[in-house]
Each structure stands twice: as C-alpha cells, then as structure tokens.
Amino acid sequence: MDYLLSSPTGNFFLLAGPCVIEGEEMALDIAETLVEITSKLNIPYVFKGSYRKANRSRIDSFTGIGDEKALKILRKVGETFDIPVVTDIHETEEARMAAEYVDILQIPAFLCRQTELIRAAALTGKMVNIKKGQFLAPESMHFAVDKVRSCGNKNVAVTERGVSFGYGDLVVDFRGIPCMQQSCECPVIMDITHSLQKPNSGSGVTGGVPERIGTIASAAVAVGCDGIFMETHRDPKVAKSDGANMLPLNQVADLLAKLTDFRTVYLKHTT
C-alpha cells in the first residue's frame, strides 16, 4: 500500500497490463514498456494480468494458457522488473494459490458481495483490490472493505468500473469516487477501460468504446482518484480477451503524460 502512494510528486498510481496472460514474451514486453513510461512520470506501477478468465459469455471463449503457467509468468514479470503484480481470483480456493505468485489479489466486480471470497483473499495477508459491482451504489462499498479489515488486513483499495445503464451499456457516476474515498477510507481506483464496455452483445463477445478512454480518465483524475486501472495490448484487435475496450500500448505514454499534467493542476487547487 505504501508503494502505491509513494510518488514524490503526489501522482496517481497505475495498475495496467493485458486482460489475460497470453504468453511470457507478450507479458514481459508490455511490462517493460509500461515500466519505462511510468518511471519517467513518477507513477507507481503495478503490472496487471489475469491468469484465468472465469467470467466468459460463451463456452468457446478463451480462458487462459493454464493456471500454473500463467501464474509463473506473472511472478517472472514482478521479479524481472521489481514491481508489484495484481491478478484476480474467482473462488475461495484460488486465494492461497494465487497469493504465492502475486502481491495484490483482485475481487471481480460481479463477485464484490461474496463474503467468503473476500475473506479468503484478505486472510492471505496480500493487499486486496475490490471492484465495485455494476449494480452497487458507491455508498455500499464500505461493507466489502469492512470484510477485509475484519480479517486484520488493512491493505485494501476499491475500483470504480461503471454502472449498468440498460442491458448493453455502462455509465460512470464520478460522484462515486469522492464518495468511496470518504466512506471506505482507502484508495479509490478508476478502471478506464472496463467502464467503457458494451456488455451483453448478441454475439456473446463484449464490445467497447475505447475512443472515450481519455475522457473517462481525465474526468477521474479531475475528481481526485488515487489510481488508474487500464488494460492494454500491442494490438487490441488480436487480443484474446476484451480487445474491444483496450488502449493500444503505443497510446499509453501520451495519455499518462496528459493525466499527470491534470493531476498537477488538481493537487494545486486541493492542497
């Protein structure tokens, strides 16, 4: 937790990487690029990658390259670049296994009310990042945070990722960021890619509006989010999961530089 808030300039922290681990070379390539970018901008950086995608619409959707293989790649990324790594878990028995390889355990939005899953993550002693459900009010997230703290684990963060707006769209209520900062008393992260999903497609493949990533990110920084979460890929069109709402890797540097400038203005007027 201290690392995430350690920027000498007061900058936000970043959780970023591919949606799912597709292979070692791909993971190391993305991590190397993001480490280079974030080090120049004084952004504390955490590599993100799912070792398995359990939440798929279609039975034939890609879920992963194998749990152990993907987890070993995540650990190698962390060791190679000396950075923390985050991955998500979906069942209680995954918590202890994943905790052997990564530094932060993430609870998916659809599972943010699952008490035993949250407790299992918290009891590993790892930091826990809980994504707010698309169906949940910001004011209710402190109950999920309380479950982590009840286990004696104070290292917790929450992530905003949009609210369901009808059957096939999401919107972001930016009031939720300061609301959760106040009620949860922990860092609040903005997921700037999943919040632009177009879920429940008739094809069974989630769509997105990636051209609005900069808009969502800028607004989140303007209201004082503590961290940014994003998924990125060299070529989102060939990504095996969630390519429709990823930010191309070659656009990350410019976006983060702009957001860093916005953060400087925010701090000037709030401190």
Predicted regions located by residue number:
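Structured C-terminal cap/extension of enzyme domains
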Residues: 5, 219-271
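Glycine-rich, proline-tolerant flexible connector loops at the mouths of alpha/beta enzymes
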Residues: 14, 18-26, 45-67, 232-243
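Structural preference for beta-strand elements that scaffold enzyme active sites
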Residues: 11-15, 44-48, 84-86, 103-104, ...
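Catalytic beta/alpha-barrel core
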Residues: 65-66, 80-94, 103-116, 127-138, ...
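N-terminal amphipathic alpha-helix/helix-capping segment at the start of soluble metabolic enzymes
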Residues: 1-15, 72, 264-271
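Active-site-adjacent loop and "lid" segments of alpha/beta metabolic enzymes
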Residues: 59-68, 104-111, 167-171, 195-222, ...
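Alpha-helix-loop-beta-strand connector modules within alpha/beta enzyme cores
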Residues: 33-41, 60-86, 121-127, 177-189, ...
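Catalytic alpha/beta core domains of metabolic enzymes, predominantly
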Residues: 124-232
